[in-house]
Swiss-Prot record:
Molecular function terms, GO-annotated: ATP binding; ATP hydrolysis activity; DNA replication origin binding; lipid binding
UniProt keyword annotations, A-Z: ATP-binding, Cytoplasm, DNA replication, DNA-binding, Lipid-binding, Nucleotide-binding
Residues the record lists as binding ATP: G159, G161, K162, T163
Superkingdom as given in the UniProt entry: Bacteria
Oligomer and partners: Oligomerizes as a right-handed, spiral filament on DNA at oriC.
GO BP, one annotated term: DNA replication initiation
Protein name, per record: Chromosomal replication initiator protein DnaA
InterPro entries named among the record's database cross-references: AAA+_ATPase (IPR003593), Chromosome_initiator_DnaA (IPR001957), Chromosome_initiator_DnaA-like (IPR020591), Chromosome_initiator_DnaA_CS (IPR018312), DnaA_C (IPR013159), DnaA_dom (IPR013317), DnaA_N_dom (IPR024633), DnaA_N_sf (IPR038454)
Pfam families: Bac_DnaA, Bac_DnaA_C, DnaA_N
Organism: Natranaerobius thermophilus (strain ATCC BAA-1301 / DSM 18059 / JW/NM-WN-LF)
Biased composition range(s): Basic and acidic residues: 87-103
Annotated stretches, region: Disordered: 87-112
């Protein structure tokens, strides 16, 4: 082949650039790089899994056609994530197919496989008021298994981070104690394996598998409700591990006392250690989660778009991140830049219809005061220190922009100030907005807070 892989990929990109819109090309191809080429395959590095999936599903045929046109050969395109190794044909075995698994051998010779998502670590977990205690408890357990809280019971709604914390515990333990036998399993899979073990007359093997571990992580324990035989088996598994100072971590969508048809003896054991909950994230945490997601996936998302999404989706982290992905995908398919307007279009079909509230000066005062850590009375008082005067000017500017109130009326709401004071504040902020990008971000964030209530 005459071209080396850099030349070949560069020519391919030029070809694709002619076929695609500028936003689509910049979104999906600008961060790609060739890393290896054989007689049949060209391996391309991509920044994140979302890009990999998108290129595979949407552009693979176009890329391979362009490659053939340029090189004269039918090359297959293969995308690699950062750190992902090229799979050779002779290495086609189970461990290669499932790189996320970590295998350990017990003294009885049975294989322990821990299924941990490499993305779910303490480093990627965003801490906020709604999950701070659960995070601290999980880290304490990871640092000192069976010494801090045993069992650790984490409960909360769907998509709030319970599974993330459980995987993070597993990763932390294995990174500090590589010889530990760590098993993560859902209660549904535990039940299915138990049923199969009874059917195949392999209950001894089943018990050896789960009673000879150092860390047992059981997700969604509420699904054991009503399954008497499985509860009986788990009861004895729990006892064996606890008596041998082995750590047990359990998650559920509700606390033990609210799980229906759960045997009292199991319920009481779940309450032996520490019970902690995770609530829905507040606005600040939702913004932080989206920023972290964008950073980890190497996505350039404008701040006002992140704030908008965080304001609109307040249910759980899974839907929040799903909203971000939807905006990215929509902007690419519609050949539009990622802006707040694009985000509004992308999310309009999945967001509940909200009747816009009539904006009031009082609502603006409360929101601005909260944003700057002040009291509403501070905005109405005669204080002229910058820490108060600047937020007051912003509040007056927004009151003039977003309400139907007259200048004298706005002045009255701010401690009986003259209408010329309101006019001066409005003009000053309007002028500063043309020069200071940071002020634009501040105003956008406050507007999003105002419309998000």
């Amino acid at each position: 082949m005459s071209e080396n892989m850099e030349e070949l990929w560069s020519k391919t990109l030029e070809e694709l650039k002619q076929q695609l819109s500028k936003p689509s090309f910049e979104t999906w191809f600008q961060s790609t790089e060739p890393v290896e080429m054989s007689s049949t395959d060209l391996y391309i590095s991509v920044p994140n899994e979302f890009t990999k999936d998108w290129l595979n599903s949407r552009y693979k045929n176009s890329i391979e056609n362009s490659l053939k046109k340029i090189s004269g050969k039918q090359l297959k395109i293969k995308f690699l994530l950062p750190g992902e190794k090229i799979k050779m044909e002779e290495q086609n075995n189970e461990n290669e197919e499932k790189p996320e698994s970590t295998s350990k051998k017990s003294s009885q010779g049975s294989e322990h496989t821990t299924w941990l998502n490499p993305k779910y670590t303490f480093d990627t977990f965003v801490i906020g008021n709604a999950n701070r205690f659960a995070h601290a408890a999980s880290l304490a357990v990871a640092e000192a298994p069976a010494k801090a809280y045993n069992p650790l019971f984490i409960y909360g709604g769907v998509g709030l981070g319970k599974t993330h914390l459980m995987h993070a515990i597993g990763h932390y333990v294995l990174s500090h104690q590589p010889n530990y036998r760590v098993v993560y399993i859902s209660s549904e899979k535990f039940t299915n394996e138990f049923i199969n073990a009874i059917r195949d007359n392999k209950t001894v093997n089943f018990r050896n598998k789960y009673r000879n571990v150092d860390i047992l992580l059981v997700d969604d324990i509420q699904f054991l409700a009503g399954k008497e035989q499985t509860q009986e088996e788990f009861f004895h598994t729990f006892n064996t591990l606890h008596e041998n100072d082995k750590q047990i971590i359990i998650s559920s969508d509700r606390p033990p006392k609210e799980i229906p048809t759960l045997e009292d003896r199991l319920r009481s054991r779940f309450e032996w250690g520490l019970i902690t909950d995770i609530q829905a994230p507040d606005l600040e945490t939702r913004i932080a989660i989206l920023r972290k997601k964008a950073y980890l996936e190497k996505l350039d998302i404008p701040n006002d778009v992140i704030v908008y999404i965080a304001n609109q989706i307040d249910t759980n982290i899974r839907e929040l991140e799903g909203g971000l992905i939807r905006v990215i995908a929509y902007s690419s398919m519609a050949n539009k830049k990622i802006t707040k307007e694009t985000a509004e279009e992308a999310l309009k079909d999945i967001l509940p219809n909200k009747q816009p509230k009539k904006m009031t000066v009082e609502h603006i005062q409360k929101t601005v005061a909260q944003y700057f850590g002040l009291k509403v009375d501070d905005l109405k008082a005669k204080k002229r220190t910058r820490s108060v005067a600047f937020p007051r000017q912003i509040a007056m500017y927004l009151a003039r922009e977003l309400t139907d109130s007259s200048l004298p009326k706005i002045g009255d709401e701010f401690g009986g100030r003259d209408h010329t004071t309101v006019m001066h504040a409005h003009d000053k902020i309007a002028s500063d907005l043309k020069k200071e990008s940071h002020l634009n971000e501040t105003i956008d964030e406050i507007k999003n807070l105002l419309h998000g209530d």
